[in-house]
Amino acid sequence: PRRRTRRASRPVRRRRPRRVSRRRRARRRR
């Protein structure tokens, strides 16, 4: 039997990074 990996149990949708200004990116970073 195949082992269940955490990634398989929790599928994540690949998001395409939108064009973000560097200022906004820096501000977004915590």
UniProtKB/Swiss-Prot annotation:
The keyword Ribosomal protein does not apply. Residues 1-30 are annotated as: Disordered. Keywords: Chromosome, Developmental protein, Differentiation, DNA condensation, DNA-binding, Nucleosome core, Nucleus, Spermatogenesis. One of its GO terms (molecular function) is DNA binding. Testis. GO terms for cellular component: nucleosome; nucleus. The keyword Mitochondrion does not apply. It is found in: Nucleus; Chromosome. GO terms for biological process: cell differentiation; chromosome condensation; spermatogenesis. Protamines substitute for histones in the chromatin of sperm during the haploid phase of spermatogenesis. They compact sperm DNA into a highly condensed, stable and inactive complex. This is Protamine-YII. It comes from Clupea harengus.
